[in-house]
Regions:
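Catalytic cores of alpha/beta
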Residues: 1-8, 124-134, 176, 180-196
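Active-site beta->alpha loop and helix N-cap motifs at the rims of alpha/beta catalytic domains
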Residues: 4, 9, 14-16, 20-22, ...
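Glycine-rich phosphate-binding active-site loops on the catalytic face of alpha/beta enzymes
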Residues: 13-25, 90-94, 99, 144-150, ...
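Conserved, mostly hydrophobic/aromatic
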Residues: 19, 85, 132, 189, ...
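Active-site-adjacent beta->alpha loops and helix N-cap segments on the catalytic face
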Residues: 23-32, 41-54, 74-80, 95-112, ...
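Short beta-strand/loop segments at the ligand-binding rim of alpha/beta enzyme cores
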Residues: 59-69, 110-120, 167-177
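Histidine/lysine/aspartate-rich catalytic loop segments that bind and position anionic ligands
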Residues: 115-150
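Active-site/ligand-binding-proximal alpha/beta "capping" segment
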Residues: 142-144, 149-195
Length: 228
């Protein structure tokens, strides 16, 4: 994993999202669910992911965020988890199973340790988009389409109007994720927003190439970045 991250960084990734595996990742499609199962079977723990970040931070300077589930944070101990994030150099936390209404469970700790709690914005009402955007920190994760993560052949949501409402309410950058896999899609999303988030497409490369995958992930990241 460290090699893959370093290749992604060397080829122009602007931010790295690392998943801490959970047995029931409700926001994820089959590709990332499969990766969660494999990681847990291989003995990946929260502490091992923390150690990975400590190693990466020897030379990786771009922002890094964790994506995981509330249960993972609770079972580790929320304060211990979030304070460790700060110490090892994690900039933000993405918890897809915590809706806006429940973020107070984690927000005070995130603010205490200066770790951004990343807000999700899905296709929803203008009022709700504005409400979430006004309180967002770090960056806003715009969900391209309702459903789970995974690659999609086309994205039909009117994302431009969602981003317009976000921009009217905050200067926090927003990036679009869920279903982005091709350079063409990435360009389209980056034209609308501040960036594109890619997960499943990279996991597929890792599944296909195994030990040889860092090189291929690097090439893929470069192709995506060049398209922007």
């Amino acid at each position: 994993t460290a090699k893959i991250v370093r290749e992604a960084v060397a080829n122009g990734a602007d931010l790295i999202e690392l998943g801490i595996p959970f047995s029931d990742p409700t926001a994820e499609g089959p590709v990332i669910q499969g990766a969660n199962i494999k990681a847990l079977a291989a003995g990946v723990t929260t502490d091992k992911v923390f150690d990975l970040v400590r190693d990466l931070r020897k030379d990786v300077t771009i922002p890094m965020v964790f994506m995981t589930y509330a249960n993972v944070v609770y079972s580790y101990g929320a304060e211990k988890f979030i304070s460790t994030c700060k110490v090892i150099g994690i900039d933000g936390l993405i918890l897809p199973d915590i809706p806006y209404e429940e973020k107070e469970e984690f927000l005070p700790l995130c603010e205490k340790y200066d770790v951004d709690l990343i807000s999700f914005i899905a296709p929803t009402s203008k009022d709700r988009i504005a409400m979430i955007a006004k309180e967002a920190t770090g960056f806003i994760y715009v969900i391209s389409s309702l459903g789970v993560t995974g690659t999609r052949s086309e994205i039909k949501t009117d994302l431009a109007s969602i981003v317009k409402v976000i921009r009217e309410n905050t200067d926090v950058p927003c990036a679009i994720g869920f279903g982005i896999s091709t350079p063409k899609q990435a360009k389209k999303m980056a034209d609308i927003s501040d960036g594109a988030i890619v997960g499943s497409a990279i996991i597929k490369i890792i599944d296909e190439y195994g030990e040889a995958s860092p090189k291929y992930v690097g090439e893929y990241v470069k192709a995506m970045k060049d398209a922007l």
